[in-house]
Amino acid sequence: MVEKIVNIDGKGVRFKASAAIPRLYRLKFRRDIFKDLTKLEKAYSDKPEGGFEIDDLEIFENVAYIMAAHADENVPPTINEWLDQFGMFSIYEVLPEILELWGSNLFTDVEAKKNSGKPTGN
């Protein structure tokens, strides 16, 4: 599990990535977060200065919302209500933070699995 506070529109917003995220995402949006994040990462790396498709923006909003809701039980129950808290903010400022958080979580899970099979010294 990894947590990070990201500044959005002058507010510190907590995000959390853990093994529960794929399930929470699937239950809320009926989509596969792994496929969606792969698509989002590709769109971001192909067009770092701009030009996201509407689908990419929706994926970003969904992922950001789920990670924020996972970190803070006081997050509003809908994405629209959550987004209404903020003025216009640049996706390019926040998206790298979300992708980094997700990547850190995956790395942490892989390292934990690698180390779980090692015997402890006695």
Predicted regions and their residues:
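Charged interaction scaffolds used for protein-protein
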Residues: M1-G12, R31-F52, H70-N122
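N-terminal first-folded block
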Residues: P22-F29
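Short linear motifs in exposed loops
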Residues: K16-S18
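A general, composition-driven signal for non-globular sequence regions
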Residues: A20-P22, T108
